[in-house]
């Protein structure tokens, strides 16, 4: 039997925010993965070309990032140690996806420097949630 300690209020706030954030990520993934041709036609041509040329491995990385993050956040809410593994999977997905966006595709040309703000924020939050879940495990908050 393992011993756990009770987490502070900040833990629950972070876990709820992480859950909401990752629900939004799943919604963004589903919107992109299942975007209809009619919806794509409403995009500027450069954006439409970006969407049409995303390789399957980058889409898979996006899916791993958001679904791993959602399950990790749910695990935080349930105080389960698997949260750290799930946030690790999510972070790997984020890194792979962002590597494609920054270094392989021409998304920076299409969206401009301002288009880097959200991806950088996603990466920072992914690192934070990975480190936070590891810390929560060390502190005995997760079982």
Predicted regions and their residues:
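Topology signature of small-to-medium multi-pass alpha-helical membrane proteins
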Residues: 1-143
């Amino acid at each position: 039997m393992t011993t756990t300690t009770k987490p502070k209020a900040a833990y629950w706030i972070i876990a709820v925010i992480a859950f909401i954030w990752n629900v939004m990520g799943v919604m963004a993934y589903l919107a992109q993965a299942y975007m209809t041709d009619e919806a794509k036609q409403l995009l500027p041509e450069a954006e439409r070309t970006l969407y049409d040329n995303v390789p399957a491995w980058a889409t898979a990385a996006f899916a791993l990032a958001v679904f791993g993050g959602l399950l990790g956040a749910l695990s935080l809410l349930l105080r389960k140690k698997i949260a750290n593994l799930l946030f690790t999977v999510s972070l790997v997905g984020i890194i792979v996806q962002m590597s494609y966006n920054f270094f392989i595709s021409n998304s920076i040309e299409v969206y401009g420097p301002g288009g880097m703000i959200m991806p950088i924020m996603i990466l920072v939050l992914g690192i934070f949630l990975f480190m936070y879940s590891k810390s929560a495990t060390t502190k005995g908050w997760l079982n």
